[in-house]
């Protein structure tokens, strides 16, 4: 049912010309992921994890699925969400509430890029509730999201250049 809705969402919407289309999928390797890989020419996947060990199992399955020859979707990198918390009244203190280093460990183990470690930050939820993206702002959290966006945009630009170069040769 979800795969059918995704197929309809992708194929029936009048998207127009897009620079980027980001899809936030549930963790794992289910029908949704495979359907998407079959119906859309994907530039790449960003694997999002959290620091907990239990999250690593899903991430490992996702990495393996995207690397299957019949799927073969490049992995742009890993983002570790909820990496740490910095209290407003103690800006020099970091708390690793859910553990530490899972994103780095996975990136190293699978020779992937660790794109970002996103903090637990109440202002992100507050901004979202008012319709303001987390990337907007002048604080370190906004800068982290801006850096992530720029890294992904650079990766996609390089990939697109490679595709054009291969077509011209």
State what each model feature region is.
Residues 1, 5-35:
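Switch II (G3) loop of P-loop NTPases
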Residues 1-4, 31, 40, 54-57, ...:
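Conserved active-site and cofactor/substrate-binding residues in soluble primary-metabolism enzymes
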Residues 4-9, 35, 61, 65, ...:
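Alpha-helical scaffold segments in soluble metabolic enzymes
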Residues 16-19, 41-44, 73-74, 110-112:
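Short coil/turn connectors at secondary-structure junctions
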Residues 25, 48, 95:
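Glycine- and other small-residue-rich loops at beta-strand/loop junctions that grip anionic moieties
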Residues 34-37, 59-60, 90-91:
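Short amphipathic alpha-helical segments
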Residues 40-80, 84-85:
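Helical hairpin unit composed of two closely spaced alpha helices linked by a short loop
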Residues 67-169:
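C-terminal lobe/tail of nucleotide-utilizing enzymes
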